Amino acid sequence: MGQKRQRDSKSSGFQSKKRKRAANDNAAADANDGWDGIVGADELNWTEVALPDRLEDAGGFFGLEEIEGVDIVRNPGNGEVRFKAKAGKPKKSVLKTKAPEEEETTHDDEWSGFSDNDTDAPETKPSPAVEEVGESDKKVDLKEAKEANKKDKKKEAKQLKKEQKEKGSAIQHDSSIKAGMSFAALQDAEEDDGVDVSAWDALNLSTELLTGISKMKFTSPTAVQAACIPHILDGHDVVGKASTGSGKTLAFGIPILEHYLEKNRDGHGDIIGKKDKKDSTPIALILSPTRELAHQLAKHIGELVTQAPGVNARIALLTGGLSVQKQQRLLAGADIVIGTPGRVWEIMSTGQGLIRKMQKIKFLVVDEADRLLSEGHFKEVEEIIGALDRVEDGDVLDEEDEAPEEESDPRSERQTLVFSATFHRDLQQKLAGKGKWTGGDIMNKKESMDYLLQKLNFREEKPKFIDTNPVSQMAENLKEGIVECGAMEKDLFLYTLLLYHPKHRTLVFTNSISAVRRLAQLLQALQLPALALHSSMAQKARLRSVERFSSPTANPGTILIATDVAARGLDIKGIDLVIHYHAPRTADTYVHRSGRTARAGASGKSVIICGPDEMVGVVRLAAKVHANMANGKRLPLESLELDRRVVGRVKPRVSLASRIVDANIAKEKISSEDNWLRNAAEDLGVEYDSEEFDEAEGKGRGRGRGRQQKQKEAGSVSKAELAGLRAELKQLLSQRVNVGVSERYLTAGRVDIEALLRGEGNASFLGPVDPLGF
């Protein structure tokens, strides 16, 4: 083993001397101050305690002050309480800072110029020590001067090289540019990666945003963008209704960034650099009903900020499931705030000065307003809107000298922008309910405006209502279909539909979290690339599922099984098929679910797997969504007939996979319940007997007994039986679904052997399968 190197005794002695000298100096300084370290409360540097903006009951605790780093010293004689700085705490840091006094004028005589008398000052011979110090100072000055000259020479050489490089690059650019071209043409020549954006000229946007739009490959504005942007730029409140996938995000994102540029320009039209984070006030608050939609809004607006030169707007994303402290730091210097109502209100209500800061916003955007403003869902939205509109008595008193009372209303300068594809309250009625059902037109302008005016406090009496698609809520290139099946055959028909579309990115919607978990395991057991997304997942897991599903490098046949958290606003490119495993409960849910496909002019399909008990709700759904159709069909959804041969051949696969998945889920549930009972028994201090609990459960009667019995049977499957089921399923999945090819006579029938050898057609089937014609 190597020995530790000894420290040099000389250097250690030198360091100890320095420490002693510093300690003696500090002690001498404290002694010279004449302060023994014990002071009264009036001499301490107290700081005021900052209270949250929203405090329900302060109980008289106002004007509190605090101090850190002191100990309490009580006089044993009279009991007087005094304070002393803690050990290691600088004594001056706990004292009040005195006002600076002009001490120089008291000690130094003021210079009054040269005297008229020729009296010379008496000559004083410097001591030898002073002469030595002077000579050493001269040597040091010479060394410093030489070093400074060397540094200056190096800087000059670097500057010359840089100028030569710039001249060379400028000469190269000049040689490639024709004579007579302007600097604007030079800029266009350098940024040749964009597209022609002349169609945007009518909106009178800034050159910075036009450059960003060009780089994002948006050749022309959509209908909702062309209709809404001019009114928003003119300062009006806007209610925008458009079909899903029509570009509503940029319809309010572009005016917000235009205001940011206008606010940050100087008198010459140049953009000012970033301000200090502490001084920045947000210009916009955008509310979203789901975390995924909030992340997508931040991504889209952030992409435009990145592509547009000179736009340095900072975006703060406030959603649940992530660190509150980090989001508070982001909010301190944000220009645009995007978030879900719960987290936004949590940060606003617990912070100091945030509500007053947010009252100065220029834009309040409510995306997917029908969901956010629906009764009983988002109480925090009402709290946020109330806080933004609230005017405290102290606010007017504090600003009497600066502004009149008329300007204290927060709504005077704030624009309210509301966007969604559905606004009518009738769309939120449950389709399968037994109460009074109202059909008819799904969109009535007057009723929608009255509904919004009750919920939101607009600045204008009548905001601009813009409806770019008054006839139908659905996208133009969307095909809608329905598959009728038995109540216990939904898994079978879902798997068959997925086999019909092997290279289609598919989104499957269910009405419950348990169905998402079971279907994800079922499709994974059938060797399909399935992902799960629901509200009980951790936020990072939710983001991971969306990222894997939307990744360009992902399997083109990836399947995302989700609840309605993915129904609104998600803009994922390449979704070809949307399957409703459960019929949607409301018509607006169906509109937003189906809107995940056929976006931005692309084509897509939406299919409902309908059981017998769901038929009434589906008929009502069609009547609501397609009430204004000219042909007047009773059921405008196209009925799809799956090949019964295919359904029969894949049934053994689905049955085996269902048994495996049900056994795994039952074992997990039994284990979790057993652990819960065992922990409860330990907490109570009693013995846990599983057999006694089983006997007690067996004697019970009533609802749910059949389900519990099936769960118990599924959980009793042994590991060997599960291994056998998995081996049998693997054997079936290794073969293609034979739908007409004779194993003995390959050339018999209408089988194209050459096409099979070339791998043409659907790789899931062996033989010809008629397409759905849908």
Swiss-Prot record:
GO cellular component entries: nucleolus
Residues covered by region (Disordered): 1-38, 73-174, 395-414, 689-717
Motif annotated as DEAD box, chain positions: 367-370
Motif Q motif location, chain numbering: 198-226
Protein residues bound to ATP: 242-249
Ranges of biased composition (kind: Basic and acidic residues): 1-10, 135-168
Annotated ranges, domain Helicase C-terminal: 493-643
A GO BP annotation: rRNA processing
Keyword Secreted: no
GO terms, molecular function: ATP binding; ATP hydrolysis activity; RNA binding; RNA helicase activity
Keyword Hydrolase in record: yes
Domain notes: The Q motif is unique to and characteristic of the DEAD box family of RNA helicases and controls ATP binding and hydrolysis.
Family of the protein in this entry: Belongs to the DEAD box helicase family. DDX24/MAK5 subfamily.
Function: ATP-binding RNA helicase involved in the biogenesis of 60S ribosomal subunits and is required for the normal formation of 25S and 5.8S rRNAs.
Protein name: ATP-dependent RNA helicase mak5
Origin species: Aspergillus clavatus (strain ATCC 1007 / CBS 513.65 / DSM 816 / NCTC 3887 / NRRL 1 / QM 1276 / 107)
